[in-house]
Amino acid sequence: MQQYLDLARYVLEHGKYRPNRTDTAGIGVFGYQMHFDISKHFPLLTTKKVHWKSIVHELLWFIKGDTNIKYLVDNKVNIWNEWPYESFKKSPHFNGESQKEFIERIRQDAKFAQQFGNLGPVYGKQWRDFNGVDQLKKVIAQIKVNPFSRRLIVSSWNPNEVDQMLLPPCHSLYQFYVQDGQLSCQLYQRSGDIFLGIPFNIASYSLLVYLVAKETNLKPGSFVHTIGDAHIYENHLEQIKLQLTRQPKPLPKVVLKSDKSIFDYQFDDIELVDYDHHPTIKGEVAV
């Protein structure tokens, strides 16, 4: 995807040093926007392998309103493990367990998972219960009856609850837009980790468009990605530079294999077709 490579190159060339809350500094810019046509192909990065299983399970987890990592852990999705583990280490119940041991106990012990696996009122909670409002269900209903509304918005940023979240929402607000039978979406992301996070976010919200479009008898249109603080961590610089040496491959397609409600979708109902990619590039997450 050339749009992603252009973003990475722009931040490498124009980014300024940015200290932050983590122990890993980086370079960043403020305010960047990408446009993706998702009507025929699916924007899953090809200059490295992106873990499709994690993207799908995380989105289904959001849609179900879940905020506990047990569902993810049970499905071998490890993208949220660090934050509950860091919280557990500060509790009086911590006895020197490694993160691997902590996650294994989450998998095996439902009571332990209920106590220590929760991230607080993060995305799923806000999408499905923002101070009592089921935003996702409400916006889908509005698309069906008033598709030209300018209020087709879901916010994950709840000032009343943000301090209770182990990680405040990076992708903070999204808006749907209907034109000529197509559904489009714009995401505002307050903070974007270009190497690890942004490829996931592009794919996740594009998949959300596919699911909501099917639910509302529309076709996928476009995805617009607006990033506030777009940054590359210093321990990802070489990985980004490696990606810039790779030629993007043709984009895959996504097939939705079920007519069930978006709220009942399962992993096997979603099929990724013809995903041709360059090899995996590893990088550590900044917690």
UniProtKB/Swiss-Prot annotation:
Residues annotated to bind dUMP: R21, R150, R151, R190, S191, G192, D193, N201, H231, I232, Y233
EC number: 2.1.1.45
Cellular component terms (Gene Ontology): cytosol
Compartments it resides in: Cytoplasm
Entry keyword annotation includes Methyltransferase: yes
GO biological process: dTMP biosynthetic process; dTTP biosynthetic process; methylation
Gene3D superfamilies: Thymidylate synthase/dCMP hydroxymethylase domain
Pathway listed: Pyrimidine metabolism; dTTP biosynthesis
Binding site for (6R)-5,10-methylene-5,6,7,8-tetrahydrofolate: H51, D193, A286
Family recorded in the similarity comment: Belongs to the thymidylate synthase family. Bacterial-type ThyA subfamily.
HAMAP family: Thymidy_synth_bact
Entry-linked PANTHER family: THYMIDYLATE SYNTHASE, THYMIDYLATE SYNTHASE 1
UniProt subunit comment: Homodimer.
Cited function: Catalyzes the reductive methylation of 2'-deoxyuridine-5'-monophosphate (dUMP) to 2'-deoxythymidine-5'-monophosphate (dTMP) while utilizing 5,10-methylenetetrahydrofolate (mTHF) as the methyl donor and reductant in the reaction, yielding dihydrofolate (DHF) as a by-product. This enzymatic reaction provides an intracellular de novo source of dTMP, an essential precursor for DNA biosynthesis.
The name this protein goes by in its record: Thymidylate synthase
Provenance organism: Mycoplasma pneumoniae (strain ATCC 29342 / M129 / Subtype 1)
